[in-house]
Amino acid sequence: MWSLLLLAALVGQGFALKNVFDMRIQCPHSVKFGETSVSGYTELPPLSLQEAEQLVPESSCNMDNHQSLSTINKLTKVIWRKKANQESANQNSFELMESEVSFKGLCMLKHRMVEESYRNRRSVICYDLACNSTFCKPTVYMIVPIHACNMMKSCLIGLGPYRVQVVYERTYCTTGILTEGKCFVPDKAVVSALKRGMYAIASIETICFFIHQKGNTYKIVTAITSAMGSKCNNTDTKVQGYYICIIGGNSAPVYAPAGEDFRAMEVFSGIITSPHGEDHDLPGEEIATYQISGQIEAKIPHTVSSKNLKLTAFAGIPSYSSTSILTASEDGRFIFSPGLFPNLNQSVCDNNALPLIWRGLIDLTGYYEAVHPCNVFCVLSGPGASCEAFSEGGIFNITSPMCLVSKQNRFRAAEQQISFVCQRVDMDIIVYCNGQKKTILTKTLVIGQCIYTITSLFSLLPGVAHSIAIELCVPGFHGWATAALLITFCFGWVLIPACTLAILLVLKFFANILHTSNQENRFKAILRKIKEEFEKTKGSMVCEICKYECETLKELKAHNLSCVQGECPYCFTHCEPTETAIQAHYKVCQATHRFREDLKKTVTPQNIGPGCYRTLNLFRYKSRCYILTMWTLLLIIESILWAASAAEIPLVPLWTDNAHGVGSVPMHTDLELDFSLPSSSRYTYKRHLTNPVNDQQSVSLHIEIESQGIGADVHHLGHWYDARLNLKTSFHCYGACTKYQYPWHTAKCHFEKDYEYENSWACNPPDCPGVGTGCTACGLYLDQLKPVGTAFKIISVRYSRKVCVQFGEEYLCKTIDMNDCFVTRHAKICIIGTVSKFSQGDTLLFLGPMEGGGIIFKHWCTSTCHFGDPGDVMGPKDKPFICPEFPGQFRKKCNFATTPVCEYDGNIISGYKKVLATIDSFQSFNTSNIHFTDERIEWRDPDGMLRDHINIVISKDIDFENLAENPCKVGLQAANIEGAWGSGVGFTLTCQVSLTECPTFLTSIRACDMAICYGAESVTLSRGQNTVKITGKGGHSGSSFKCCHGKECSLTGLQASAPHLDKVNGISELENEKVYDDGAPECGITCWFKKSGEWVMGIINGNWVVLIVLCVLLLFSLILLSILCPVRKHKKS
């Protein structure tokens, strides 16, 4: 074992790519009763015949291989060769050589070996060989107790130059066999096969090993003779033994033949009718050529005197097992026949054999494991969310458009769990699991992160910090309003004067700028008037020497005195008395504004008179009266804003925030509603219809329309199969085409085109001297059949909704279809039309459990199907297997001295593979609450892809006198509450509702606090006690949720938990799809104050320490105010 591990670690990458192969063993995630074993196999590339005879399997698995497989087994080797003398070549120009050969580890299982390996926790590892005269293709088989699935994930098997990596894969099946994406549990009872209508039928791959054992109960040839109705003698002296089989790679041993086990009967029938079983072709060997040399008889063993086995010699790629056991002797004479097809046809009595290993499909009755709904929850993890999905049975499919769904599975008894990571929580997480759409509202996760952060910052008082955090972390404006309210209450006495001072400083800054600007503008106006007046009376103000325009008379006189003397009139600096020199000096002179400033001091007052700036300076922002007034006013305004913003979070698709009560409609005219409703949505309409003449007279109206149900009458077409198409050329030099039987003749679907007596020198191999004597057989057949889905053809489809109306004390219900109406004395409810994607004649294909939805095919062949069409290979229930037609043309390709080769120009890709390649072009649909038989399928659409056009008319002709009083009495009591207020997930309130005075009453029960209602549930009450669960979203920490009916509520309410960091469960889409409309009034100012008061009382009654802490903080702010802003002392006069 260790040598193998070391070798696997040291081999190069090229060796690993070429010589390491996978064997995948599928394990259910629960160990069932009985000696259950799991099995697997893998095909290996060819090696020489001499190497094949030296093979010995090795294993690094922690379950040791059964010891009996290490013993040497002897077989009779039969091989053919051409005769040395070919001068007179004919159809008998070849001969056989028999000899004894020894193998170690060949699949020659002993009696009770599999059972002992189960009890001793040992594995059975062996191999089989498919050989021609020069090379062999090994196939490795492994049988291991099911406990290995829990003990290891992988191990390594060595066989010659090859390494096989055994990988244990957990399926989502509890104990069943995975087929068609569903978990099938076969039933061995014969009665289930007789009553097939009560059971499902599935095609399961089976592996069988022949075990030679003498005894009267093991006379297998007698059973074969009886099954085929042949009259063979001396069956008691022929081979004895039985086949031990593992069904679907996961079952307890099945022994064939066994009359009391239907599984054994099917296996035995398959071995007799198709003794070669599945071929051993590797990928790329679907197209191959055989050259048949002819039939010959051999002596088994070689020491006997007479020939007792007929074989067919061939040359080409080996496709079928070369091991068998002779039927003519009870001593167990095993055969190894490379390059020879042994005669396995049991319709003749002599010269035949039985296959040592058989692999093929059998049809079994049984049942499919139930698909359980998924539970999905998420918790915050770093910047994203860590989620987990689990289901009671198994998870057959889980996807998410916004998460990285891993393959990490955990199993606890029958429960499967899958963990995955979502990188973003800024949007809701959508997960599709077991055909259900789950929505995880991540807003609650963000709330939890906020609470966690605030609580961590103030960890000295965790209880108080948490109580404050749950108020601050409510999303939206309400959280900010809460923060503003708490800050104002605690620190308002410090923040109000501080903020006022900051505002005053800003205002004074702008006032000062405005004041200065006004003074400058007035001074400029004075200068302009002085200049205009001087120019009118005395002339120009421009200096004659420097040409500078002066602003005052005093400045002009200074220019006239200084400029002449070559001095600057401002700074008295000497400069040349020229215009250019003086103008250049003015640009650098610092005193040019001297005369302007002197005049400004004369005309502008120095002190600022009373005005805005002075008023701001005199404002008493430290006044205790001002602070108290502002503090009180801010608390009132913020409380109103807080209460108004504490709205519920709307239910999808519609729930409006409303107060207690029900809306009323005066019946002046007929009441008509016309709308479109998605197929997944329920609709509730509730109103009080009032007499337009007398408002005191009213009748309650309650209409409930359930979600759309889809019912289709179908024809069960059966199971659709994927398959591989093989094209084999078989050439023999002598004889008619009917002379030989080829192994593919026993395949379920095959077709052959023969070119008989057409060979010539231009179309012959060099060792075939005959001309016009032989046959070229072109054989098409399907192998590797695998069921992939179940198909149903729609005969008719019906869309319906259940409609219930409570009009006063009258209660009526009816299920209406498309273009149908429900008419009562006062109401008419019609489905005018339905927008749908289903139509008569469509085919529904389910590629897995029907709970996961399916694909719609508009064109599905049901007769004259060609290979490659949708529905090409079908296995109908209780009918023979349906094979496709092969419409392509054959061509025999010939070359001189070359074996002819068949060519086929038709399609070679199966219909299933074509559909997978273009699957996005087909319409798909999801299902929920699906119920099905072979004749009918009923389900609901969880995605709302279909829509109904609904029209409701309520007549205005109502007898208000007799219908105004409703005798039904409803009593309410809040029993339990789960969930959290103010979160995205919401809460669920359980109400005990009693009904008296009438037998049945359709109404709605709502979840409300003192002010508003957050959710409602339409329910049909029966006389006595009823339990009603209401889902709501919203509220605050002081909300006491009560059960309400109209304006009447239960006496006591229950408080929901605070939103926190716990896991957030996914919400099923169907549970959330309801439209509720009762016309209740919206929340007004009175309602807002009720909410504020309820919140304050909730804090006082809840965690009163929080109120103490807030008051301490208020006292601290008052002390801080007295220190920073002391009261001014007034002196006594």
Curated annotation (Swiss-Prot):
Sequence segments annotated as region (Fusion loop): 755-775
Zn-finger region bounds: CCHC-type: 543-563, 568-589
Any GO molecular function: zinc ion binding
Record topological domains on the Cytoplasmic side: 505-626, 1126-1133
Record topology, Lumenal segments: 18-484, 648-1104
GO biological process: fusion of virus membrane with host endosome membrane; signal transduction; symbiont entry into host cell; symbiont-mediated suppression of host innate immune response; symbiont-mediated suppression of host TRAF-mediated signal transduction; virion attachment to host cell
Glycosylation sites (chain numbering): 132, 233, 345, 397, 926
GO cellular component: host cell endoplasmic reticulum membrane; host cell Golgi membrane; host cell mitochondrion; host cell surface; membrane; virion membrane
Ranges of residues in domain ITAM: 609-632
Ranges that cross the membrane: 485-504, 627-647, 1105-1125
Organism domain of life: Viruses
Disulfide bonds: 27-149, 61-155, 107-126, 131-136, 173-183, 208-245, 232-349, 374-433, 378-387, 403-422, 450-473, 733-768, 737-775, 749-883, 763-894, 778-902, 804-813, 821-830, 861-865, 968-998, 991-1043, 1008-1013, 1044-1049, 1083-1087
Keywords linked to the UniProt accession: Disulfide bond, Fusion of virus membrane with host endosomal membrane, Fusion of virus membrane with host membrane, Glycoprotein, Host endoplasmic reticulum, Host Golgi apparatus, Host membrane, Host mitochondrion, Host-virus interaction, Inhibition of host innate immune response by virus, Inhibition of host RLR pathway by virus, Inhibition of host TRAFs by virus, Membrane, Metal-binding, Phosphoprotein, Repeat, Signal, Transmembrane, Transmembrane helix, Viral attachment to host cell, Viral immunoevasion, Viral penetration into host cytoplasm, Virion, Virus entry into host cell, Zinc, Zinc-finger
Name by which UniProt lists this protein: Envelopment polyprotein
